[in-house]
Amino acid sequence: MYALVKLFSFGTLSKFFKNMKNEDKKAIALTYRVGYTYFESWIESIANVRNLCAHYGRLYNAILSKTPKMYKQFSDKGIGNNRLYGVLICISLLVPNNDNWIEFVNFIEETANRYSYAKLETMGFPEDWKEILLDTRKYLKK
């Protein structure tokens, strides 16, 4: 099974997960410490963003058609689920806070500084966006 999943595209993986039995979805989502309904919407949203990037879609100021289910703690902070930042929140909850993720977040900051005319707010980034992305789990109840 693991070898088969390694061959899937992200879109195929999303569809495969959606068609699994709920108990299997729960077991997989549990390894990421999230609810399976959240996990399912997240991988579908991530696949959608991936497809936008792969097919020359626009992420800047884009309103996403496939939106991830957000934890209340994030929506209470004013983080929407229909912009890029909402999807980045989901990705940050699926990857460990390792060097690659930190490097990616720093790259976003460097790019935003280099192109100061491009406003991160148009993609749903709040003022404290970097702090949140680097430590998303602290916003979730233990």
Please tell me what each predicted stretch does.
Residues 1-142:
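Long, contiguous internal "core" modules enriched in hydrophobic/ aromatic residues
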